[in-house]
UniProtKB/Swiss-Prot annotation:
GO terms for molecular function: rRNA binding; structural constituent of ribosome. PANTHER family: 30S/40S RIBOSOMAL PROTEIN S3, SMALL RIBOSOMAL SUBUNIT PROTEIN US3C. PROSITE patterns: RIBOSOMAL_S3. Residues 43-116 form the KH type-2 domain. Part of the 30S ribosomal subunit. It is found in: Plastid, Chloroplast. Belongs to the universal ribosomal protein uS3 family. GO terms for cellular component: chloroplast; cytosolic small ribosomal subunit. InterPro entries: KH_dom-like_a/b, KH_sf_prok-type, Ribosomal_S3_C_sf, Ribosomal_uS3_bac-typ, Ribosomal_uS3_C, Ribosomal_uS3_CS. This is Small ribosomal subunit protein uS3c. GO terms for biological process: translation.
Length: 215
């Protein structure tokens, strides 16, 4: 039976790049890795806390961290960056992260990049499906709506999988749907992937999304 490898790790160096770009001494490596996780968690928690009530999608596609001796550069790729830009929240977020890291001799720089087609990115799409499932929308309806949104974003194919106690059924099961082509075996095919856990009143559901972006 074929083993299912993570599509992003499988394509590293071919069509995928790293989201953390820095070098460290072996003895400091784990500390730097934990620091990266702290930064990512801090950003996600801040946006979740300050999110508008009506928007169920945070819209973070990915967070890129670049480090030098005296500088930490953080680039947040967002689908809907209004929240941070309009209310000057980015300075507040920057101060929060600086407090969390407690690094005096390093400057922290933050930038926000807007994504052209937010629903062409699996993380944002997974958040959309999670919001639908939390509002007790039928999983098939949520999947079909998600596929419509990605088609508008101009992708070549998509596969969505939801696993768990779907619709509150006693027995957990896996449901999936595919539209277009999703060549997982081809390394040169640019495939975006994400796995996301959503907590519903019936328990946790796992959402996995593969999007075929380009050859």
């Amino acid at each position: 039976m074929g083993q299912k490898i993570n599509p992003l790790g499988f394509r590293l160096g071919a069509t995928q790049g790293h989201h953390s770009l820095w070098f460290a001494q072996p003895k400091n490596y784990s500390e730097d890795l934990q620091e990266d996780q702290k930064i990512r968690d801090c950003i996600k928690n801040y946006i979740k806390k300050n999110m508008k009530i009506f928007s169920s999608v945070e819209g973070i596609a990915c967070i890129e961290i670049q480090k030098r001796i005296d500088l930490i550069q953080v680039i947040i790729y967002m689908g809907f960056p209004k929240l941070l830009i309009e209310h000057q929240k980015i300075e507040e977020l920057q101060m929060n992260i600086q407090k969390e890291l407690n690094s005096v001799n390093r400057k922290l720089n933050m930038a926000i990049t807007r994504i052209a087609n937010p629903y062409g990115h699996p993380n944002i799409l997974a958040e959309f499906i999670a919001g639908q499932l939390k509002n007790r929308v039928s999983f098939r309806k949520a999947m079909k709506k998600a596929i419509e949104l990605t088609e508008q974003a101009g992708t070549k194919g998509i596969q969505i999988q939801i696993a768990g106690r779907i619709d509150g059924k006693e027995i957990a099961r896996v449901e999936w749907i595919r539209e277009g082509r999703v060549p997982l075996q081809t390394i040169k095919a640019k495939i975006d992937y994400c796995s996301y856990t959503v907590r519903t009143i019936y328990g946790a559901l796992g959402i996995k999304i593969w999007i075929f972006v380009d050859e």
